[in-house]
Amino acid sequence: MSGPGPVSLRVALPWLHAAAAGAGAPDVRLPAAEWLVARGDAPVAVQAPWRTWLAGDALAPAGGLARHAAGPCLRALDGGADAGLTWAALRPVHLLTAIDHLQVAERPVHLEIDEARAIAADLGRHFAEDGYAFHVGGRRDWLLGIDRDLRCDTVAPDALPGRNLRDLMPRGEHGPAVASFINEVQMLLHEHPVNVARAARGEAPVNALWPWGYGRGVAQASLELPSLCTDDDWLVGAWRVHGSTAQGTAAPGALDSLLRGGAREVLIAWSEPAEAAVIESCCFEPLLGALVRGDVVVDLLIGDRARRIDHRARRRFWRCRRPLGEVLA
């Protein structure tokens, strides 16, 4: 009788390629990461967005990740379903002026909670008659509640930096209305007291809010899902909709504990850049340990390239470790 098969680990690090191979990347060696990349199969290009690749068929019984818009999923983290409302995520961003277009700055904007609440309160008063409600919590994205159906296709904020904003504007039935909302918010933020104070301190102003992930409130329904370890609120919210919880990524030992706990399928994602030492100790070292201990298959997505690493890696001793910047360049 055959056994249960290898443990499946799918790992997404969408930002690591740019961080390791880009100009000015730190000259830091990551032994576990280098071992895994050196001994894995040849990389394969992935066309799907990284979250879709990571989730695979896990959410297929509920229509896939495409049926789990970010807005309602983030709302689920607050314990609300609100099936009669449309929800969108709002990302505070800093826009830069290029030669002939606007683009989102690479560096994320950090707002103190009091700053965020002050901006949200003023915007809420301005847009109250339009049926918009602004919600600020402890997460990077705010929430926008809308009292009517609103349908459009939007671009997730992790795909924005450095690109022409004109090419990324919302599309679909209500795309023009959402674009008008973006422009109106920009005008309201231009001389907002929070931004005036930030500029006086030498901090980048929040001169735009990027709405994304529009969808109706999602009714919760139980679904058996793989174990999830991630810092990504959208994925955590999608799991919450179906009665599952997720582990965080940053806590020391969190992933290692999960891998040692007997799970047969684990999805792992670091959506935001992390310090080299942290990603090595909290991600790559536990993955290497799992490979050494037993029958494990790791599918590792770095940027838009996926590598498979399995039991054969232990025999590929002739493949020498090299700095990630050299391998990924």
Outline where the language-model segments fall.
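…; additionally, a secondary subgroup of soluble metalloenzymes is captured
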Residues: M1-A329
